[in-house]
């Protein structure tokens, strides 16, 4: 039996000792979630009372996996840029290929990603589900669910004898974002950041939290409907006139291509390198399902 399974069984046994008390704190956790920011178009995320627990072993496995996969992704992206025959395998339309082939303006080929896997915790074996390198999300759901779980009786009892930690995904991403931005040409110390998406698809509450974290790091930051960006005289602006230095792109590539004619100012600014696009179109190479074949 793996340590992960043993800990899960221990957690379950604790919940059996006082069912009524655990039911009460489970309801309190659910009530917290219902009133939290972990919502998408009015719907709340759901979770089990017993969380998935991983140990240092899994953390090492996942860390090695990420390092290996990023190395593979970078080789694939490099081959795509250099080999026309290889590019044809991906089947991207010419307008998207043009955006992908732009010369990178910073050092990180894939600034952020979520690699989804089916994991066998007994053996450490896994199968890939998705390489999400385009519009990666769910950081806020993770944050809020961890807060909710920590309010439960079972978690508090387990925490008396075990040390738990969760991963901080907001300040860590903002700091990484700014590090990447500062590797681009002529960076400002504190850039003005636009978090852009098609707002009918956006996880707006998550964006608002990211904006607050950017502000805490000395930046101006706004949520912005990607269609409403304005490109004038070599500068990109938000509708209220904020000059945009860097974009945190949450608009997925498929939506951008679907609405290509509606986002002309955004596209023009990107092609002119008038703005630093964190989450550039080259990430679509790793995101494409052709890599499974």
Which role fits each region the language model picked out?
Residues 1-293:
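Preference for protein termini
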